[in-house]
Amino acid sequence: MSDVAETLDPLRLPLQGERLIEASAGTGKTFTIAALYLRLLLGLGGSAAFPRPLTVEELLVVTFTEAATAELRGRIRSNIHELRIACLRETTDNPLYERLLEEIDDKAQAAQWLLLAERQMDEAAVFTIHGFCQRMLNLNAFESGMLFEQQLIEDESLLRYQACADFWRRHCYPLPREIAQVVFETWKGPQALLRDINRYLQGEAPVIKAPPPDDETLASRHAQIVARIDTVKQQWRDAVGELDALIESSGIDRRKFNRSNQAKWIDKISAWAEEETNSYQLPESLEKFSQRFLEDRTKAGGETPRHPLFEAIDQLLAEPLSIRDLVITRALAEIRETVAREKRRRGELGFDDMLSRLDSALRSESGEVLAAAIRTRFPVAMIDEFQDTDPQQYRIFRRIWHHQPETALLLIGDPKQAIYAFRGADIFTYMKARSEVHAHYTLDTNWRSAPGMVNSVNKLFSQTDDAFMFREIPFIPVKSAGKNQALRFVFKGETQPAMKMWLMEGESCGVGDYQSTMAQVCAAQIRDWLQAGQRGEALLMNGDDARPVRASDISVLVRSRQEAAQVRDALTLLEIPSVYLSNRDSVFETLEAQEMLWLLQAVMTPERENTLRSALATSMMGLNALDIETLNNDEHAWDVVVEEFDGYRQIWRKRGVMPMLRALMSARNIAENLLATAGGERRLTDILHISELLQEAGTQLESEHALVRWLSQHILEPDSNASSQQMRLESDKHLVQIVTIHKSKGLEYPLVWLPFITNFRVQEQAFYHDRHSFEAVLDLNAAPESVDLAEAERLAEDLRLLYVALTRSVWHCSLGVAPLVRRRGDKKGDTDVHQSALGRLLQKGEPQDAAGLRTCIEALCDDDIAWQTAQTGDNQPWQVNDVSTAELNAKTLQRLPGDNWRVTSYSGLQQRGHGIAQDLMPRLDVDAAGVASVVEEPTLTPHQFPRGASPGTFLHSLFEDLDFTQPVDPNWVREKLELGGFESQWEPVLTEWITAVLQAPLNETGVSLSQLSARNKQVEMEFYLPISEPLIASQLDTLIRQFDPLSAGCPPLEFMQVRGMLKGFIDLVFRHEGRYYLLDYKSNWLGEDSSAYTQQAMAAAMQAHRYDLQYQLYTLALHRYLRHRIADYDYEHHFGGVIYLFLRGVDKEHPQQGIYTTRPNAGLIALMDEMFAGMTLEEA
């Protein structure tokens, strides 16, 4: 195989067999894919063409992100459309289409074919790798052994945490105290362990180098380590009296091993040697008496002090005293197995599972049948961003298309831009593929950047023969496109070099000083550019065309959120507006989320003074303490606010949460007030984002109370991995953009700053790839040779990151350089710059001092590359010129549409304003109302368990996840308490409480929850009841009062006339002795003990909150469901009744307490069925 790549002509590339196309940054990869796509659609290319034209459904394009998929699909659709127009007109000014037209004989027929393709683009086979695997598994379910009805889960982090907590509980809880202490010194808990191993739980498992024996236990490892330490302690005690004389008579260099320190060291070690061994920590001074250290401190030609003790210390220090490798090896295997087992139990698939399932299926006995089926469907596959592949993905592609007749596999990517190792991408897989695919092509023209930018990158990466450290990743210089030859960046009348290095003065500097200084230099330079741009003195030129530099032209590329914060702070100090484009925080972690919760609680219950006062005190409402105090002292003014919030409550019930929030924000001028404050645009964006999430969740939940619970839960457990929760960009208009290098890949910016590009982080974990097999290897003992290999891979990836960063800029790139020293202690002499990517290229991998670094930079400089001393300037802020804007007027809405169709719920029908029943029961605590009470009694009971929205949700969730037939596991309860944010002291109470609930007889049949198997119960049964004609509160209320004595004593129903769908969730539906029952859990607090939960008290609670309407609606829903599912269904025979379980009142000593049962009249359910179907009811 030749390493020389052929320059690619997209219109002459042979479209059969396997081809590897390496597309350097800015060389038109997307353009090339689109051109090849058009050729394949029309069968163009002469002898290099595919044997026949293909449809969009036969042409597979695989890329690695949803965004790239959408971009490619749009680009291909646009090209198909434009070529079709060119065929119809038989002329074009597009060079690509012009060449294609020359090959098309029948342009009218080609136009028809392209029109068909354009119309079918929604069905085009453009997928992410995971989307491709999922589709192949589903379409070939029998060949792949794929189960039907499997749910795809995007995020497995919670599953992995639960599996890790389970591992910790099984292995660490039973440990003796002395071993548990050692484990605790390494990891404080399961979260810390998971942080250490999380990256190795995704994708294929790495090979463990020198794994511990299968039969080794923590106890045996601990005993072995303690014995080794105790042996050295005994040797020290035996020999310590001889050490002074032995060392004194040797050739030790007393300048490096002085007597005063020697005495201190001996005292410290002697004290340690007398102690019982409870820790693996060794005294730092023990190393001073190792044979190796003493040899280093002996004078030249002098006699080294020697003793068996020194050799024993050498051996003790040479081998790790750790249980880390043992715990991690077991954890990796067991957690992977636990997660896989749990996903099988739930019928779930993760993204990695789709890859492994298809990979396994293709390697099975029927694998060739599956491969043939996929090849038949997709004769041609183009794999975009192939440098980000992994071993499984490559095996899949190779198994399907390798050496197959009348197929093509086109692998397209740039190994120089492989920067996603943290996501599982594996550059070594690319290197293996490169050695196995013999046809290599390259794109040789950069269409993005100015000639100076292209030349400077070429020159920098040509400083060494192995710029990217591996011969399989060569650097091939590229040309600058003709269209870009006139691009220039002019500042104060002078054309600027394309690349400029800002070098800090001094012999050395630490990371903190480097980042602080460079952030200031970067901000000051950006300010100067912007001020010059306002004067017309900073211009982006293209020939005679020029435009002044604006803030949005400038991007600062960083490695982390911490670096972004430093740059943003420096820009803010100079009053330069900026935006961080890589923020992945959850919006539920913001103050706005908490304030939104208080606001919703106030709208839901404006009668509660404390709740309303909390909402008014939020920063988004804009009131100060004096305003609130004035309201407190003015009863009339307070009543006006209560009425205002009651109005919002009505809007919420009738139209939803977002219209309510819009009305509130409009009435209170919240948007205007926020935008007038610093950071207001960011806060307003978060409020609107949360509003959208609330609106979406509200369509899936049955009541306003449930929505408040939902928000409360997400604030307690935000998930920054969920894309819907990640904070949105407030604005990038006229702002300096700060973005991570990873996020910038594939993008371009006119002007780029890399302030911290000299920084690096030495690899600490010995995770690397075998240089022969390319297998991923994890050395948990961190042998020096393993660490060296891992460090080499770290540096190689940093070089690829540098390449990506430098190739983002169109006109100019500035770099912050410093004589960086990361080591502690003496910082004179050689710096550590050569360990960074930029330093390796500048210094050709050799250590240099600050003067040597400067010499290397000077040697690199030419017309395109320059350097300047970095000095922090003044803090003069940027003065923005006033920009006049045209006054805009919104068009006035001329009519209001009338539509009362909506999705509502039981809660939406029964909720109303403050009622008499609520006054009569002041201690009643509904699931989502009230606040947690302070526990004062010394003995904990279920009645003291916290009350409020979150505890109510927590109690419900316990019964959703529980296997009723099994004993309650205290460890499971403890874990649930921890996840729910409750103290572990509740575990015994909760375990006994749940057991009592499960074993309590529910009705006269004696059935209990503990008797219900999984096949006889349905948890959280969702239903929709159509409301065909407008439902009127008074008519429904009259009907149910006529048939149900409980309803007759209830407050009147009040709700707006509604038509549409009524949605709800039944906590539990179960079958017993052929009859079906519905059960609802209630966490209401009725009193201090179970005696408060009498039938009369529970009936009063049912009436006060109109639970009668709830069970009537639920019964109607279940009645309709059973009528369609059971052939000979009869309400009287099949429906057993309703059970309301007041959880706090269930008491095994008093079986009737806490359980309310009823059974709606059959006539009532029949008439409700007619009413909801839109039929007119006869007068009773």
Curated annotation (Swiss-Prot):
The effect of D1067A is: Subunit loses nuclease activity
Q: What is this protein called?
A: RecBCD enzyme subunit RecB
Source superkingdom? Bacteria
Query: How is this protein activated or inhibited?
Result: After reacting with DNA bearing a Chi site the holoenzyme is disassembled and loses exonuclease activity, DNA unwinding and Chi-directed DNA cleavage; RecB remains complexed with ssDNA, which may prevent holoenzyme reassembly. High levels of Mg(2+) (13 mM MgCl(2+)) or incubation with DNase allows holoenzyme reassembly, suggesting it is DNA bound to RecB that prevents reassembly.
- BP terms from Gene Ontology: clearance of foreign intracellular DNA; DNA recombination; double-strand break repair via homologous recombination; recombinational repair; response to radiation
Q: Record-annotated residues binding Mg(2+)?
A: H956, D1067, D1080, Y1081
Notes concerning its domains: The N-terminal DNA-binding domain (residues 1-929) is a ssDNA-dependent ATPase and has ATP-dependent 3'-5' helicase function; both are stimulated in the presence of RecC, suggesting this domain interacts with RecC. Holoenzyme reconstituted with this RecB N-terminal fragment has no nuclease activity. The C-terminal domain (residues 928-1180) has weak ssDNA endonuclease activity as an isolated fragment. RecD probably interacts with this domain. The C-terminal domain interacts with RecA, facilitating its loading onto ssDNA. Interaction is decreased by ATP.
Q: What happens when the gene is disrupted?
A: Decreased degradation of DNA with free ends that is unable to undergo homologous recombination, which can fortuitously lead to more efficient viral infection. Cells are deficient in DNA recombination repair and have increased sensitivity to UV light. The cultures have many inviable cells. Cells cannot be transformed with retron Ec48-containing plasmids.
The species this protein was found in: Escherichia coli (strain K12)
